[in-house]
């Protein structure tokens, strides 16, 4: 993937860029693998906003991605197409299995149209192949990793993401996450070899607010420019700094959003670096 920059013909075009979509080989999805997707606008079943800054955006269809490939062990598949997916930053690959079934997977870096991929304990160590962690050599970069055996891929699924397999000891494998965190995972968990493709997506300059609205993202208004009735940082004469440590609109201090008693935390060997320790 390469980034194509626009000429500054308008204020919105100045500095903006877009993917050249050179890797994409088809401009429409497989009909049997799409589902209707109804936007919720950040609302819950009661109609109340539970997630701010969501709403609008272009109409989309959901592409059904295969995050559990264990039922296709020993069945080779040919990469028929590399496609765009509006629901994620990564591209997706359409696989045609030898038994006639078609499925989507996240497209790893370097996977080309016409390549053959496989899954199972005896699969080769090459991009796109899916196998248990116990069968992957230490030092390999992987993505689409399960947290629990058979639970489906949960980690490292966005564009450019990868996890490094550091080593294996007993029934656990040590993984270095994209955040720098080191975590232990059951060696029976599956992963796909390689890094997620479309890494240059992070360098796209969206250029104008309207392009973010096309994506379904609404404006994020700072608390210090609100009135006191709307935010703890609001009000004051002229420009102010808020007068207190940063908080949410409901008065909760910013940061520390991780659940403190999550069951899987006992498998974290080293925490990610945050704040002052991020060096």
From Swiss-Prot:
UniProt key word rRNA-binding: yes
Recorded GO MF terms: rRNA binding; structural constituent of ribosome; transferase activity
Region (Disordered): 33-58, 223-279
UniProt xrefs under Gene3D superfamilies: 2.30.30.30, Nucleic acid-binding proteins, Ribosomal protein L2, domain 3
GO annotation terms (biological process): cytoplasmic translation
Keywords: Ribonucleoprotein, Ribosomal protein, RNA-binding, rRNA-binding
Xref: SUPFAM superfamilies: Nucleic acid-binding proteins, Translation proteins SH3-like domain
Source organism, top-level taxon: Bacteria
Biased composition (Basic and acidic residues): 253-268
Disulfide bond annotation, renumbered to this chain: none
Biased composition (Basic residues): 37-58, 269-279
Pfam families: Ribosomal_L2, Ribosomal_L2_C
InterPro entries reported in the protein's UniProt record: NA-bd_OB-fold, Rib_uL2_dom2, Ribosomal_uL2, Ribosomal_uL2_bac/org-type, Ribosomal_uL2_C, Ribosomal_uL2_CS, Ribosomal_uL2_dom3, Ribosomal_uL2_RNA-bd_dom
GO cellular component: large ribosomal subunit
Subunit structure, as described in the record: Part of the 50S ribosomal subunit. Forms a bridge to the 30S subunit in the 70S ribosome.
Job of this protein: One of the primary rRNA binding proteins. Required for association of the 30S and 50S subunits to form the 70S ribosome, for tRNA binding and peptide bond formation. It has been suggested to have peptidyltransferase activity; this is somewhat controversial. Makes several contacts with the 16S rRNA in the 70S ribosome.
The family this protein is said to belong to: Belongs to the universal ribosomal protein uL2 family.
The name this protein goes by in its record: Large ribosomal subunit protein uL2
Gene behind the chain: rplB
């Amino acid at each position: 993937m390469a980034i194509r920059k626009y000429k500054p013909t308008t204020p919105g075009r100045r500095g903006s860029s877009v993917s050249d979509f050179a890797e994409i080989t088809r401009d429409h999805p497989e009909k049997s693998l799409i589902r209707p997707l109804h936007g919720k606008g950040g609302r819950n079943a009661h109609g109340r906003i539970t997630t701010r800054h969501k709403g609008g955006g272009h109409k989309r269809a959901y592409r059904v991605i295969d995050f559990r490939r264990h039922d296709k062990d020993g069945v080779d598949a040919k990469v028929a197409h590399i496609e765009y997916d509006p629901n994620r930053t990564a591209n997706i690959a359409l696989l045609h299995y030898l038994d006639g079934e078609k499925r989507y997977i996240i497209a790893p870096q370097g996977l080309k149209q016409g390549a053959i991929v496989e899954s199972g304990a005896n699969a080769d160590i090459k991009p796109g192949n899916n196998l248990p962690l116990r069968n992957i050599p230490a030092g390999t970069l992987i993505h689409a990793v399960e947290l629990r055996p058979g639970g489906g891929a949960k980690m490292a699924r966005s564009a450019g993401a990868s996890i490094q397999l550091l080593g294996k000891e007993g029934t656990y494998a040590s993984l270095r996450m994209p955040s720098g965190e080191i975590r232990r995972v059951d060696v029976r968990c599956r992963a796909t070899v390689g890094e997620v493709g479309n890494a240059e997506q992070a360098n796209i300059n969206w250029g104008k607010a309207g392009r973010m609205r096309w994506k379904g993202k609404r404006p994020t208004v700072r608390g210090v420019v609100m009135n006191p009735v709307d935010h703890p940082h609001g009000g004051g004469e002229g420009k102010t700094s808020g007068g207190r440590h940063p908080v949410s609109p409901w008065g909760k201090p910013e940061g520390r959003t991780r659940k403190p008693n999550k069951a899987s935390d006992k498998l974290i060997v080293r925490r990610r670096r945050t704040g002052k320790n991020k060096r």
